[in-house]
């Protein structure tokens, strides 16, 4: 019943009047009958079972709706046939920290299961992060992505969490009108890639002891500029999300030459060795 409710919510998002920033007024709706909707003989988390109730045609152009529905139908089948089993494996095999190697050396490696790694590849192939940045369907690309995430989330074994943070990081870079550094441009390309071998996830390392609801005002981490253009960070983050990500964003205050730091927090890109090598 939960999946049926999710399916109905997804279809409503695509077929009812959805107001987008570039569409201040909805277009007229057309009535559709259940017989005109796609059907599937295989398990899917997109098409309701046994048959959907009458719904209203989307206000989006038919040229956009048809391929979107086809993709969501196919993805729904993949959720039922593959992703849900992987999600169950992720929940049955939570990550853990391996503190020592076989020789007693301190390593502190984060160990994740193979199903978790496979979720990353699937997310790239399906364009779960990439869709809204490709703009293939204009302002409807966000609605399309949201529908796909709704289908994916309940069966993802919580992999939807790092994907949401990855989307947030990509949006930050996209909002930078210049994408001011080669590193930013490279990172944006990886965050929005559909190729598993080049797709990156991003963490968000922001929360400090004084953070509360005022994350910016409670940030005490200081960033000292280095001669090579990087920053040396000094501070305490008591929560670091998506620790296995390929990159992360963190908040800090940049220290100037006089030892003073800005009141407004600056968003910095913290890179691991993988990014440095690419």
Name each model feature, range by range.
Residues 101, 226, 256:
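Acidic surface patches and DE-rich sequence motifs
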Residues 1-138:
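Extended, charge-enriched "interface" segments that sit outside catalytic cores
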């Amino acid at each position: 019943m939960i999946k049926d409710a999710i399916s109905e919510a997804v279809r409503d998002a695509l077929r009812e009047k959805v107001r987008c920033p570039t569409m201040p007024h909805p277009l007229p709706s057309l009535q559709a009958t259940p017989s005109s909707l796609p059907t599937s003989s295989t398990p899917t988390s997109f098409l309701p079972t046994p048959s959907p109730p009458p719904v209203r045609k989307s206000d989006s152009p038919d040229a956009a709706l048809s391929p979107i529905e086809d993709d969501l139908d196919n993805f729904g089948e993949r959720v039922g046939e593959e992703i849900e089993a992987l999600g169950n494996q992720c929940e049955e095999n939570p990550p853990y920290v391996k503190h020592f190697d076989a020789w007693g050396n301190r390593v502190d490696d984060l160990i994740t299961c193979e199903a978790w790694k496979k979720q990353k590849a699937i997310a790239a192939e399906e364009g779960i992060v990439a869709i809204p940045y490709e703009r293939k369907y204009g302002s409807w690309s966000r609605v399309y992505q949201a529908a796909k995430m709704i289908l994916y989330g309940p069966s993802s074994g919580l992999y939807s969490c790092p994907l949401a943070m990855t989307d947030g990081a990509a949006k930050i870079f996209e909002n930078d009108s210049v994408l001011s550094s080669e590193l930013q441009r490279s990172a944006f390309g990886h965050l929005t890639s559909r190729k598993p071998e080049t797709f990156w996830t991003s963490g968000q390392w922001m929360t400090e002891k004084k953070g509360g609801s005022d994350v910016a005002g409670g940030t005490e981490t200081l960033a000292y500029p280095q001669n090579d253009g990087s920053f040396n960070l000094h501070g305490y983050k008591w929560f670091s999300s998506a620790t296995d990500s390929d990159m992360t964003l963190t908040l800090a205050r940049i220290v100037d030459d006089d030892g003073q730091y800005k009141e407004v927090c600056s968003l910095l890109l913290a890179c691991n060795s993988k990014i440095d090598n690419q």
